[in-house]
Design a protein with these regions (language model features):
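A structural "hinge/loop" feature
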Residues: 1, 21-22, 48-54, 115-127, ...
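N-terminal lobe/hinge region of extracytoplasmic solute-binding protein
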Residues: 1-29, 66, 151
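Envelope-exposed proteins and targeting segments
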Residues: 3, 21, 30-34, 38, ...
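Residue-level signal for nonpolar/aromatic packing positions in well-ordered secondary structure
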Residues: 7, 24-25, 47, 108, ...
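Aromatic- and charge-enriched surface segment that lines or borders ligand/interaction sites
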Residues: 23-75, 107
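Surface-exposed binding/hinge segments that line
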Residues: 37, 62, 69-135, 160-162
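Second-shell loop/turn segments in exported
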Residues: 42-52, 94-96, 146, 157
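Bilobed "Venus flytrap"/periplasmic-binding protein-like clamshell domains
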Residues: 149-174
Length: 174
Protein backbone atom coordinates (compact mmCIF):
# COMPACT_ATOMS: atom_id res chain seq x y z
CA UNK A 1 0.00 0.00 0.00
CA UNK A 2 2.91 2.39 0.47
CA UNK A 3 4.49 1.90 -2.97
CA UNK A 4 1.48 1.58 -5.24
CA UNK A 5 -1.94 3.01 -5.89
CA UNK A 6 -4.92 1.19 -7.34
CA UNK A 7 -7.85 2.32 -9.48
CA UNK A 8 -9.95 2.74 -6.34
CA UNK A 9 -9.31 2.85 -2.63
CA UNK A 10 -11.74 2.51 0.26
CA UNK A 11 -13.47 5.14 2.33
CA UNK A 12 -12.06 4.60 5.83
CA UNK A 13 -15.43 5.08 7.52
CA UNK A 14 -17.90 3.50 5.08
CA UNK A 15 -15.45 0.96 3.59
CA UNK A 16 -16.88 1.66 0.13
CA UNK A 17 -14.85 2.23 -3.05
CA UNK A 18 -13.73 5.80 -3.69
CA UNK A 19 -11.63 7.30 -6.51
CA UNK A 20 -7.86 6.80 -6.50
CA UNK A 21 -6.07 6.41 -9.85
CA UNK A 22 -9.53 6.32 -11.43
CA UNK A 23 -11.41 9.58 -10.92
CA UNK A 24 -14.75 8.10 -11.94
CA UNK A 25 -16.30 5.04 -13.53
CA UNK A 26 -19.40 4.29 -15.52
CA UNK A 27 -21.25 1.00 -15.79
CA UNK A 28 -23.47 0.01 -18.71
CA UNK A 29 -27.14 -0.75 -18.03
CA UNK A 30 -26.50 -4.48 -18.34
CA UNK A 31 -23.62 -4.25 -15.82
CA UNK A 32 -21.14 -5.84 -18.21
CA UNK A 33 -19.17 -2.82 -19.47
CA UNK A 34 -17.12 -0.75 -17.04
CA UNK A 35 -15.33 2.40 -18.23
CA UNK A 36 -12.80 4.02 -15.90
CA UNK A 37 -11.61 7.62 -16.29
CA UNK A 38 -8.00 7.87 -15.11
CA UNK A 39 -6.43 10.62 -13.04
CA UNK A 40 -4.11 12.85 -15.06
CA UNK A 41 -0.75 14.21 -13.91
CA UNK A 42 0.15 11.21 -11.72
CA UNK A 43 3.89 10.53 -11.57
CA UNK A 44 5.72 7.26 -11.04
CA UNK A 45 8.73 7.36 -8.76
CA UNK A 46 12.15 6.34 -10.07
CA UNK A 47 14.92 4.05 -8.90
CA UNK A 48 18.54 3.25 -9.73
CA UNK A 49 17.43 1.26 -12.80
CA UNK A 50 14.75 3.52 -14.23
CA UNK A 51 13.60 7.11 -14.58
CA UNK A 52 10.09 7.54 -16.01
CA UNK A 53 9.60 9.74 -19.06
CA UNK A 54 5.81 9.98 -18.89
CA UNK A 55 2.92 10.15 -16.44
CA UNK A 56 0.62 7.30 -15.46
CA UNK A 57 -1.87 6.39 -18.20
CA UNK A 58 -4.07 3.61 -19.60
CA UNK A 59 -1.04 1.61 -20.79
CA UNK A 60 -0.11 1.04 -17.14
CA UNK A 61 -3.55 -0.30 -16.29
CA UNK A 62 -3.46 -2.69 -19.24
CA UNK A 63 0.05 -3.85 -18.31
CA UNK A 64 -1.00 -4.51 -14.71
CA UNK A 65 -4.20 -6.37 -15.63
CA UNK A 66 -2.86 -8.37 -18.57
CA UNK A 67 0.20 -9.48 -16.62
CA UNK A 68 -2.15 -11.37 -14.33
CA UNK A 69 -4.79 -12.35 -16.86
CA UNK A 70 -2.84 -13.42 -19.95
CA UNK A 71 -0.52 -16.45 -19.63
CA UNK A 72 1.25 -15.25 -22.82
CA UNK A 73 2.07 -11.81 -21.37
CA UNK A 74 5.86 -11.38 -21.11
CA UNK A 75 5.57 -10.62 -17.38
CA UNK A 76 3.10 -13.38 -16.49
CA UNK A 77 5.77 -15.79 -15.25
CA UNK A 78 8.33 -13.25 -14.00
CA UNK A 79 9.08 -13.84 -10.31
CA UNK A 80 7.08 -17.07 -10.54
CA UNK A 81 3.83 -15.12 -10.53
CA UNK A 82 0.70 -17.14 -10.09
CA UNK A 83 -1.70 -14.30 -9.20
CA UNK A 84 -3.76 -16.37 -6.79
CA UNK A 85 -6.07 -13.58 -5.67
CA UNK A 86 -6.82 -12.48 -9.24
CA UNK A 87 -7.86 -16.07 -10.01
CA UNK A 88 -9.49 -16.81 -6.64
CA UNK A 89 -11.95 -13.92 -7.00
CA UNK A 90 -12.67 -15.15 -10.52
CA UNK A 91 -11.43 -12.17 -12.51
CA UNK A 92 -9.68 -14.47 -14.99
CA UNK A 93 -13.08 -15.88 -15.95
CA UNK A 94 -15.14 -12.73 -15.38
CA UNK A 95 -13.16 -10.36 -17.62
CA UNK A 96 -13.94 -10.94 -21.27
CA UNK A 97 -11.60 -8.16 -22.44
CA UNK A 98 -9.86 -4.99 -21.34
CA UNK A 99 -8.92 -2.20 -23.71
CA UNK A 100 -7.44 1.25 -23.82
CA UNK A 101 -10.07 3.68 -25.11
CA UNK A 102 -7.55 6.54 -25.01
CA UNK A 103 -4.70 7.61 -22.70
CA UNK A 104 -7.08 8.29 -19.81
CA UNK A 105 -9.91 5.80 -20.29
CA UNK A 106 -9.89 2.03 -19.85
CA UNK A 107 -12.83 -0.23 -20.60
CA UNK A 108 -13.54 -3.70 -19.23
CA UNK A 109 -16.03 -6.05 -20.86
CA UNK A 110 -17.33 -8.68 -18.44
CA UNK A 111 -18.89 -12.01 -19.23
CA UNK A 112 -21.59 -11.27 -16.65
CA UNK A 113 -22.44 -8.52 -14.16
CA UNK A 114 -20.54 -8.74 -10.88
CA UNK A 115 -21.31 -6.67 -7.78
CA UNK A 116 -17.77 -7.00 -6.37
CA UNK A 117 -15.97 -5.95 -9.56
CA UNK A 118 -15.34 -2.35 -8.48
CA UNK A 119 -14.16 -3.27 -4.98
CA UNK A 120 -11.71 -5.80 -6.43
CA UNK A 121 -9.74 -2.93 -8.02
CA UNK A 122 -9.00 -1.53 -4.56
CA UNK A 123 -7.24 -4.70 -3.37
CA UNK A 124 -3.46 -5.05 -3.14
CA UNK A 125 -3.31 -7.49 -6.06
CA UNK A 126 -4.72 -4.69 -8.27
CA UNK A 127 -1.76 -2.36 -7.73
CA UNK A 128 -0.89 -0.45 -10.87
CA UNK A 129 2.63 -0.95 -12.20
CA UNK A 130 4.52 1.09 -14.76
CA UNK A 131 4.32 -0.40 -18.25
CA UNK A 132 7.22 1.83 -19.29
CA UNK A 133 9.38 0.36 -16.51
CA UNK A 134 8.34 -3.15 -17.52
CA UNK A 135 9.29 -2.51 -21.13
CA UNK A 136 12.64 -0.97 -20.16
CA UNK A 137 13.57 -3.88 -17.88
CA UNK A 138 12.54 -6.43 -20.51
CA UNK A 139 14.85 -4.71 -23.03
CA UNK A 140 17.71 -4.82 -20.49
CA UNK A 141 17.08 -8.51 -19.81
CA UNK A 142 16.24 -7.87 -16.14
CA UNK A 143 12.43 -8.16 -15.94
CA UNK A 144 12.65 -9.32 -12.31
CA UNK A 145 13.60 -5.74 -11.34
CA UNK A 146 9.94 -4.79 -11.77
CA UNK A 147 9.19 -6.94 -8.72
CA UNK A 148 12.49 -6.63 -6.84
CA UNK A 149 12.88 -2.85 -7.25
CA UNK A 150 9.27 -1.65 -7.57
CA UNK A 151 8.29 1.64 -9.15
CA UNK A 152 4.86 2.92 -8.19
CA UNK A 153 2.73 6.01 -7.76
CA UNK A 154 2.19 5.54 -4.02
CA UNK A 155 3.26 7.90 -1.24
CA UNK A 156 6.65 6.20 -0.83
CA UNK A 157 9.43 4.81 -3.02
CA UNK A 158 11.72 1.91 -2.21
CA UNK A 159 15.18 3.21 -1.32
CA UNK A 160 16.89 0.09 0.01
CA UNK A 161 16.10 -3.57 0.48
CA UNK A 162 18.21 -6.16 2.28
CA UNK A 163 16.76 -9.67 2.39
CA UNK A 164 15.55 -10.66 5.89
CA UNK A 165 17.07 -7.50 7.30
CA UNK A 166 15.88 -4.11 6.14
CA UNK A 167 13.42 -2.23 3.96
CA UNK A 168 13.90 1.51 3.67
CA UNK A 169 11.42 3.86 2.02
CA UNK A 170 11.65 7.51 1.06
CA UNK A 171 8.79 9.87 0.36
CA UNK A 172 7.72 9.83 -3.27
CA UNK A 173 8.88 13.27 -4.45
CA UNK A 174 5.86 13.63 -6.71
Amino acid sequence: QVLYNRLVSFDPVKNTPIPSLATEWHVSEDGKTWTFTLRQGVKFNSNKFFKPTRDFNADDVLFSVLRQMDPQHPYHKVSQGNYEYFHDVGLDKLIKSVKKVDDYHVQFELNEPNAAFLADWGMDFASILSAEYGEAMLKKGTPENVDNWPVGTGPYALQQYKVDSQIRYIANPH
